[in-house]
Amino acid sequence: MAAVTKPLVLITGANQGLGFATAQQLASTGQYNLLVAARSQEKAEGAVKQLESSTNSSLTPIVIDLDQDESITAAAKFVEERFGSLDILINNAGINRSSDPNATLRESYRAVFETNVFGVAVMTATFLPLLRASKYHDRRIVNVTSGLGQIGIAYSPTSEYSAKIWELPIYRSSKSAINMISAVDAVSLEKENILVVLAAPGFCRTNFGGGQGVKSAEEGARPIVRAATEGSPKELFGKLVDDENTLVEFGW
């Protein structure tokens, strides 16, 4: 088992976009060891190679396909055997639509929820024993959500996240589900001193959004990094770190 002297952070979807930018920012501090997760070994190793030149942190590629329980279980077993525990889990990976242009409505909902909701729920449940095994004083689970998942502002005629501007019912509802899962997990795990916090990066220029967006991936990663590493559990409990990198109270 490898000796870990820095907090160990696992980031899903870390080979591109917000996940890669988050890994980059954490790696640049030299204060964290990273598990760089992607759907394939090739993608994970490619991301590690790009990150290696800018850090003295340990970078370990790991394969995680959120649509496959066996993949998640195998990844957890690898982390347990290699490191013994995990300190911070960042559930970043997600999709906004089915990859099948001919998918039915039911198939489209299922594809997005499979990754964005079921995958995140299974990741958290599977890696929770490793978080419980951690001796780190500030264990965290960060779930990446979206302002589009906030039900109240979907009605607003003035909000940039209004349903009048962005319909996207499948993606929006998947992020609403993540918000509720996060709230329930936060309350449940508070007594174990494991913080569950949400981060909403905003509309960023990544492949996820077709290269469109008002923020760079680097800007979008900042709320994720803050949620993962800054503030106290008391300060962050029940909060969301929004796309302006500020804390939002209950009600999202």
UniProtKB/Swiss-Prot annotation:
Pfam families: adh_short (PF00106). Its EC number is 1.1.1.-. The keyword NADP applies. Coiled coil: none annotated. The keyword Amino-acid biosynthesis does not apply. NADP(+) binds at L18, D65, N92, Y171, K175, T206. Disruption phenotype: Does not affect the annullatin D biosynthesis pathway. It is an enzyme of class 1 (oxidoreductase). GO terms for molecular function: oxidoreductase activity. Keywords: NADP, Oxidoreductase. Belongs to the short-chain dehydrogenases/reductases (SDR) family. Highly reducing polyketide synthase; part of the gene cluster that mediates the biosynthesis of annullatin D, an alkylated aromatic polyketide with a fused dihydrobenzofuran lactone ring system that exhibits potent agonistic activities toward the cannabinoid receptors. AnuI does not seem to play a role within the pathway. PANTHER family: CARBONYL REDUCTASE 1-RELATED, CHAIN DEHYDROGENASE FAMILY PROTEIN, PUTATIVE (AFU_ORTHOLOGUE AFUA_3G15350)-RELATED. This is Short-chain dehydrogenase anuI. It comes from Penicillium roqueforti (strain FM164).
